[in-house]
Amino acid sequence: MATSNSKPTQVLLATFLTFFFLLLNNVNSSDELSFTINNFVPNEADLLFQGEASVSSTGVLQLTRVENGQPQKYSVGRALYAAPVRIWDNTTGSVASFSTSFTFVVKAPNPDITSDGLAFYLAPPDSQIPSGSVSKYLGLFNNSNSDSSNQIVAVELDTYFAHSYDPWDPNYRHIGIDVNGIESIKTVQWDWINGGVAFATITYLAPNKTLIASLVYPSNQTTFSVAASVDLKEILPEWVRVGFSAATGYPTEVETHDVLSWSFTSTLEANCDAATENNVHIARYTA
């Protein structure tokens, strides 16, 4: 009579079942994207560039054009992370929470005349720079496209203010939360330091639909913070790309927009009941 040792088979089966249930739990529990870029490299494979954005030989992400160390007029550029982010789930109704941090420098030849700032933003994966989006529009909007069709949420770091020309714009440099247009829904004054390294953190708390932006200059430990209620599910498509945009303006109103480092993490918690009803699925973005 043939005999066999069943212990290895039992161990193998137990290992398989453990792996299966871990995988099943992971699919049901969250959909996550996380990355950290401590130093940019030319021709960065993980980034998509639009306009005049580029990476310098020293590993700095330059969002607008710089020639011989000098910022140039009427320049606009974007840099986005190549992999799309699933910001909400059409099947379960769940919305992602995210947090991003980055260090940056804005430097102007004349600190009394600056233009125009930079922004972190979320937009449809195929979003492109609109025409006429230099200067105050930060490469995101123009004078005729401030409506819900944009599907853009941004946090602007605005260095230019011209309240006499644009009554909606605060009469101070500011951090603003933008929804589908350049007129911010909430702002806080920002005491910009010319050439200073700033550390910014932007967080979205999905359970209470709150977008929070804060900025600190390590050199003086002054913190600026603003928050607003934003329903990403009502504004953005299911999949987005995240990144930066910046623009300069008139010949004398220029500055550099340099990003030194960047990290991002998003987690989309699944609705287990809905996932069970609709069978387990692994999400993939298709263009």
From Swiss-Prot:
Belongs to the leguminous lectin family. The glycosylation on N-90 is determined to by of the high mannose type in PubMed:26003537, while PubMed:27720757 found a paucimannose at this position. It comes from the Eukaryota. Residues 1-29 form the signal peptide. The gene is MAL. SUPFAM superfamilies: Concanavalin A-like lectins/glucanases. InterPro entries: ConA-like_dom_sf, L-lectin, Lectin_LegA_CS, Lectin_legB_Mn/Ca_BS, Legume_lectin_dom, Leguminous_Lectin. GO terms for molecular function: carbohydrate binding; metal ion binding. Keywords: Calcium, Disulfide bond, Glycoprotein, Lectin, Manganese, Metal-binding, Signal. Ca(2+) binds at D158, Y160, D166, D169. This is Seed leukoagglutinin. N-acetyl-alpha-neuraminyl-(2->3)-beta-D-galactosyl-(1->4)-beta-D-glucose binds at Y74, D116, S133, K136, Y160, D166, E253. Mn(2+) binds at E156, D158, D169, H174. Sialic acid-binding lectin recognizing oligosaccharides containing terminal sialic acid linked via alpha-2,3 bond to penultimate galactose residues. Binds the trisaccharide sequence Neu5Ac-alpha-2,3-Gal-beta-1,4-GlcNAc. Binds fetuin when fully glycosylated but not when the high mannose-type glycans are removed, although the secondary structure is virtually unaffected by deglycosylation of the high mannose-type glycans. The lectin activity may depend on the presence of a single GlcNAc attached to N-90. Glycans are attached at N90, N142, N208, N220. Residues 279-287 form a propeptide. Homodimer; disulfide-linked. Dimer of homodimers.
